């Protein structure tokens, strides 16, 4: 899990760095107080959640921070002077992203008291948030200020705490309700193979964690006469346009963010808009894309499963499906649909994947024809086209 801490005074970050020092699965990220650095952290590091201090929200940097938060779909943890009356400052417009509020007094305790009485609870809540980036599905929770009365005792220790003991020992306003992991049916219902015409090849690609760099390696082999490519890279809305523009400046092919109705042609690469699901369809001799709003699918929007299902239905054996590095299982189920409808499917191997989640899940269910290292995938795609 990657936690981005934005704290103008540095106290909160120090606490979390020390608190998670023995957790090998947790990385504390820092973006400083530069807007460009902040955007780069989201594009390159893919944090699972963001922690913001109230003083930071009320500072001059708060405006830049608010602009970024409006374009991401990650849960925010807010450190407030008063957890019942938080002052969101410049973040007032994006306060709906805040899903956990912690009283700042917790961080002013001695290290021993903090670790024994509050750290286990806070760590549990952060890990729950980090595992489930469904911000619309959370009820706001508040961790109250410590009890400094003379009768208060520290009885619990971090190493013997579990979910039930924590929930019984502390007053937390609500229980987190996780939204279901939506099936692609909520966006596009599977109707079998709709288009049975033989056409030129189209390439559909899904990627997530580590995908921004993987796509750069994948795309460098393609030319102006290469088959059209449609890509879903898990990335917040607002960032996909600049990502596509940067790629377009790097390669000798046309790369753009998807717009509704874009017609596919050789040498064109379409990057899914981070705010919409993307599907490919076929009509009157042309493949084209549509942007669809709606709920998260496989915990993502855009979802690889949505794109792959549309390719299974409208392209069939005319499609080549590629699943690259990424966490989770988005894309696996509908890559199998593609394969069953005649598409050729490829997965990145474990050795070259930053996270071998999405490719592994596709391989496990028999959705993959070929497993290849990243450096060989593009050439193999071109040979099959």
UniProtKB/Swiss-Prot annotation:
Compartments (UniProt record): Cytoplasm
Alphabetical list of CDD domains matching this protein: CheB_Rec (cd16432)
Top-rank lineage group of the source organism: Bacteria
Domain CheB-type methylesterase positions: 196-385
InterPro entries the UniProt entry points to: CheB-like, CheB_C, Sig_transdc_resp-reg_Me-estase
Residues with the 4-aspartylphosphate modification: 53
The protein's Enzyme Commission number: 3.1.1.61, 3.5.1.44
Its biological purpose: Involved in chemotaxis. Part of a chemotaxis signal transduction system that modulates chemotaxis in response to various stimuli. Catalyzes the demethylation of specific methylglutamate residues introduced into the chemoreceptors (methyl-accepting chemotaxis proteins or MCP) by CheR. Also mediates the irreversible deamidation of specific glutamine residues to glutamic acid.
Domain remark in the UniProt entry: Contains a C-terminal catalytic domain, and an N-terminal region which modulates catalytic activity.
Protein name: Protein-glutamate methylesterase/protein-glutamine glutaminase
Source lineage: Bacteria, Pseudomonadati, Spirochaetota, Spirochaetia, Spirochaetales
């Amino acid at each position: 899990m990657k936690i981005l801490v934005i704290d103008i005074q540095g106290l909160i970050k120090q606490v979390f760095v020390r608190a998670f020092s023995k957790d090998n699965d947790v990385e504390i990220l820092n973006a400083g107080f530069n807007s460009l650095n902040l955007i780069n952290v989201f594009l390159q590091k893919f944090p699972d959640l963001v922690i913001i201090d109230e003083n930071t929200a009320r500072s001059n940097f708060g405006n830049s921070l608010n602009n970024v938060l409006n374009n991401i779909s990650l849960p925010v943890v807010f450190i407030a002077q008063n957890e019942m009356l938080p002052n969101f400052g410049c973040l007032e417009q994006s306060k709906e992203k805040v899903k956990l509020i912690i009283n700042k007094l917790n961080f002013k305790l001695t290290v021993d008291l903090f670790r024994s009485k509050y750290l286990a609870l806070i760590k549990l809540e952060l890990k729950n948030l980090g595992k489930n980036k469904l911000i619309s599905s959370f009820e706001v929770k508040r961790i109250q200020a410590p009890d400094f009365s003379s009768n208060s005792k520290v009885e619990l220790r971090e190493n013997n705490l579990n979910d039930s003991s924590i929930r019984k020992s502390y007053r937390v306003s609500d229980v987190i309700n996780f939204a279901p992991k939506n099936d692609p049916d909520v966006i596009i219902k599977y109707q079998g193979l709709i288009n049975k015409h033989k056409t030129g090849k189209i390439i559909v690609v899904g990627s997530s964690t580590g995908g921004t760099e993987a796509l750069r390696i994948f795309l460098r082999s393609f030319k102006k006469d290469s088959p059209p490519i449609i890509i879903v890279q898990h990335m917040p809305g607002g960032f996909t346009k600049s990502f596509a523009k940067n790629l377009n400046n790097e390669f000798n092919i046309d790369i753009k963010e998807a717009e509704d109705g874009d017609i596919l042609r050789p040498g064109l690469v379409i990057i899914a808009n981070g705010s919409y699901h993307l599907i490919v369809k076929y009509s009157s001799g042309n493949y084209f894309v549509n942007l669809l709003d709606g709920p998260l699918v496989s915990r993502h929007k855009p979802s690889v499963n949505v794109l792959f299902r549309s390719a299974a239905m409208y392209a069939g054996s005319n499609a080549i499906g590629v699943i690259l590095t990424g966490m989770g299982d988005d894309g696996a189920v509908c890559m199998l649909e593609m394969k069953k409808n005649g598409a050729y499917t490829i997965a990145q191997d474990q050795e070259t994947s930053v996270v071998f989640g999405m490719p592994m899940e596709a391989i496990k269910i028999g959705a993959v024809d070929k497993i290849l290292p990243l450096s060989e995938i593009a050439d193999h795609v071109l040979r099959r086209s």
